[in-house]
Amino acid sequence: MSAVGAATPYLHHPGDSHSGRVSFLGAQLPPEVAAMARLLGDLDRSTFRKLLKFVVSSLQGEDCREAVQRLGVSANLPEEQLGALLAGMHTLLQQALRLPPTSLKPDTFRDQLQELCIPQDLVGDLASVVFGSQRPLLDSVAQQQGAWLPHVADFRWRVDVAISTSALARSLQPSVLMQLKLSDGSAYRFEVPTAKFQELRYSVALVLKEMADLEKRCERRLQD
């Protein structure tokens, strides 16, 4: 086992009857969160709340770099420590906000943070972000940010049989012609052999099934 926190599985209290549940942080504790948790015990509570406010503002799309630098100077925080705290808070909140409130309950969230030895009062501050009045705005901003890249708007395909081609080996061999249109208006056309098309169909169906099974399994464990 590596000495780095990222390689350590997410642990639970020895007496926890739900020791097999999955953390909202994943099966492996993110290194940013592990580093942050080690620093919170000696961190001034006022400084923590100011950092948390900056992280929330960052998640809402605001640029807080100058304010963070000023806080680091006034609180006498080394740059490395400041970066570790911000990265850990950002990762923790981002992971929690990925799950709908119906999947991640407040009590479960608090219990799992306490298992990381995060002080009780700081757990309450973090929970107020994930389950408080700012949640709708954070969800809205996350959806907008996720829509920056173009997505598939239309996908069509048809089977084509070439009866005349310069490649004699391909004569009378069926293929699949595909047309992909994206939300930004761009379109792509390409040709795929039927064997590869069948592999693609199988792979996509398998991935979708595994994703659905994993989602159901995680939801059940988080609700335990």
From Swiss-Prot:
Subcellular location: Cytoplasm; Nucleus
Residue numbers of N-acetylserine PTMs: 2
Gene Ontology cellular-component annotations: cytosol; nucleoplasm; nucleus
Keywords in alphabetical order: Acetylation, Cytoplasm, Nucleus, Transcription, Transcription regulation, Ubl conjugation pathway
InterPro entries for the chain: COMM, COMMD5
Tissue expression: Highly expressed in heart, stomach, jejunum, kidney, liver, and adrenal gland. Expression was generally higher in adult organs than in fetal tissues, particularly in heart, kidney, and liver.
A Pfam family hit: COMM_domain
Annotated ranges, domain COMM: 151-215
Binding partners and assembly: Component of the commander complex consisting of the CCC subcomplex and the retriever subcomplex. Component of the CCC (COMMD/CCDC22/CCDC93) subcomplex consisting of COMMD1, COMMD2, COMMD3, COMMD4, COMMD5, COMMD6, COMMD7, COMMD8, COMMD9, COMMD10, CCDC22 and CCDC93; within the complex forms a heterodimer with COMMD10. Interacts (via COMM domain) with COMMD1 (via COMM domain). Interacts with RELA, RELB, NFKB1/p105. Interacts with CCDC22, CCDC93, SCNN1B, CUL2, CUL3, CUL4A, CUL4B, CUL7.
Family: Belongs to the COMM domain-containing protein 5 family.
Function statement: Scaffold protein in the commander complex that is essential for endosomal recycling of transmembrane cargos; the commander complex is composed of the CCC subcomplex and the retriever subcomplex. May modulate activity of cullin-RING E3 ubiquitin ligase (CRL) complexes. Negatively regulates cell proliferation. Negatively regulates cell cycle G2/M phase transition probably by transactivating p21/CDKN1A through the p53/TP53-independent signaling pathway. Involved in kidney proximal tubule morphogenesis. Down-regulates activation of NF-kappa-B.
Name listed for the protein in its UniProt record: COMM domain-containing protein 5
Organism field: Homo sapiens
Taxonomic lineage of the native organism: Eukaryota, Metazoa, Chordata, Craniata, Vertebrata
